[in-house]
């Protein structure tokens, strides 16, 4: 039922989409031709009545009605309402497809974790996958009309081989008025636990992996049920439908061609068929038809999901994976590129031109810079001493006017001047410093009057430390203290577990 045209648009070429306009199955023409003919018929009937049936006075009144409808029909926000609605429907449609229960991951885990080449192991694997397929069939026949027509009763499910008669009895004996698509998943988990107890599943990690994948499969079945149960709010669908239909009902009257002799504005041309009004109806009504077809993809429209095909494919593939393909491996051989330093698959003559194209290295790989632009530069503010940078930072933290008043501000200024002088002396650029002969302060030739030794703040002398007390006469203490080592512990009672590491412990 799905219309596939992917191969037709594999390459972009002149008129690539034009050939798709000639397709009939799944086309907009197939969906809309009845509504389009109905709209055109009503339009032509009103036009004929205006031209041939109405009296002159009635024609004047009809012309006023045409002008009124044409003026106020644009107040209906058709594009706005349709745009949001169709976006919501398409998003919902794709999410429903992503919730289709596919057994591919589950069958790989079953084939890798449930072991045994005998009939018992084979029975476990086939039954597990049959339960998964049964759960998918039960949920799809609940939401898809095509699947329900194929399996209208549980008897048809039993005859198709998805359920045994004993399982049907257990299924029908469950006292529940709700949908029981989840019952085969419970059977699956119980059978997997039984296989673990028998050793078919060798560890709990494998059982955990199997049940986690089963929960993913079951959650997809549950989401299909909820998508079928919770629809797009009816009021939204009604608003969109009423907006589109009322707009074109107004267009039936407002887009009529009037008598040019009356001199109405924008009515200087008299035609029989409204070409652009029909195109507008085709686009807007076709937009609504898109939402109408995609809102439930589990029907029997041309573009609905191939649910019966998926049931057949999933059942056959899952049985092949866990039965005939189980532990069936080809002999291990060295590949063609075993001794090759660089493995490269060959190209045909039709694709040999791809070898001439360079591999992508990154968007900045081919950027070229001038030689002078590639030289590292020292950052401004880092060349100075670290103390100067810290001093500037502390100065910014002080309140306004506090940098020059008080001992802290004077010390920060003095520290900044000292660092500046030492930095200039080390580079020998413009300042020469020499120590005084009498051991006084440093003389700098920087020309800064603030560096005069007489203006410096006197340094505080450290307080005199008291002399240490005289030693007390007495015996000289030993340099080390002797500590007695305890003997080995007594053996513990036999009913107590031995502490960790006691076997390696030896008496000191």
UniProtKB/Swiss-Prot annotation:
GO terms for molecular function: bicarbonate channel activity; chloride channel activity; intracellularly ligand-gated monoatomic ion channel activity; ligand-gated monoatomic anion channel activity; ligand-gated monoatomic cation channel activity; metal ion binding. GO terms for biological process: bicarbonate transport; chloride transmembrane transport; chloride transport; membrane depolarization; sensory perception of smell. Residues 52-60, 256-274 are extracellular. Residues 1-31, 83-238, 289-508 are cytoplasmic. Pfam families: Bestrophin. Residues 455-508 are annotated as: Disordered. InterPro entries: Bestrophin (IPR000615), Bestrophin-like (IPR021134). The keyword Membrane applies. The chain crosses the membrane at residues 32-51, 61-82, 239-255, 275-288. One of its GO terms (cellular component) is basolateral plasma membrane. Pentamer. Interacts with GLUL; this interaction tethers a fraction of GLUL to the membrane, causing a decrease of cytosolic glutamine synthase (GS) activity and inhibits the chloride channel activity of BEST2 by affecting the gating at the aperture in the absence of intracellular glutamate. Ligand-gated anion channel that allows the movement of anions across cell membranes when activated by calcium (Ca2+). Transports a large specter of anions, namely mediates the movement of chloride, L-glutamate and iodide. Calcium-binding triggers the dilation of the aperture, but calcium-dependent gating is only effective when the size of the passing anion is bigger than the closed aperture. Mediates the calcium-activated hydrogencarbonate movement and participates in colonic hydrogencarbonate secretion concomitant with mucin secretion. This is Bestrophin-2.
